[in-house]
């Protein structure tokens, strides 16, 4: 059996061809360059690979899901471009963000054109019921991404966010698109209703684990692995599961201290916040929740027939928690 990175490389190369084909006719040249900047900058392309693997795991040809795989990656890229503008982030995938190189107006257009091209990539597969069903899944994921971003922005003004609210936010902002990749891929592969539902659940679970692990790495990893200062989420005041849990469990004194550190921008105080997380088991709790979602994801794969594709999906689920950045 291949290693996870080899699997992702193989399937991402299959998706890349359709992605390039989908955006090749964008004009003028400036818009094309801005649109393809993050696509050519790298990234593991886990989402399109999951779409292709899901099609194969239900007995289909992964090529039948190539349009869906391309659409998912184009939507993901559009969301990154717009997120970087909203968050005023200047670096993405080790490269200057699109809005840094081409300005905000062109970056907005680049995101918009990728969003539009995503739907074109799906409907190029024809107008069969499978295509219509897959298209509906992709459309729904776009709505959820916007809702998730709005929830996340709203959390910046609140300190009473519950775990349930946080999980809803990361489901919509992150996991919904991953679930759409696996569900739409299974649809295009001709999966049964049970197989399609199982793969949607698998995608949702690894999507939630992915985001929680991201938050976890921010406080337990190192600057070299992260490519950014440890605890930068704390310095920026981002709401994470660890923040939610620490605020819920902490003494009044520690709660007030944590609140004063969150969003202060003072990296010197980050270590103190991490100590508060540790004191109340918030870091350990987040890791346990991520582990539980990976376990649930792998359990849902048992609905499928044994195959190399199913094994690859299980390996990717484990990989979500093995990565260091």
UniProtKB/Swiss-Prot annotation:
Binds 2 Mg(2+) ions per subunit. The keyword Cytoplasm applies. Pfam families: polyprenyl_synt (PF00348). Its main location: cytoplasm. InterPro entries: Isoprenoid_synthase_dom_sf, Isoprenyl_diphosphate_synthase, Polyprenyl_synt, Polyprenyl_synt_CS. It is found in: Cytoplasm. Mg(2+) 2 binds at residues 83, 87. Mg(2+) 1 binds at residues 83, 87. Its cofactor is Mg(2+). It comes from the Archaea. Belongs to the FPP/GGPP synthase family. This is Short chain isoprenyl diphosphate synthase. It comes from Methanothermobacter thermautotrophicus (strain ATCC 29096 / DSM 1053 / JCM 10044 / NBRC 100330 / Delta H) (Methanobacterium thermoautotrophicum). The lineage of its organism: Archaea, Methanobacteriati, Methanobacteriota, Methanomada group, Methanobacteria.
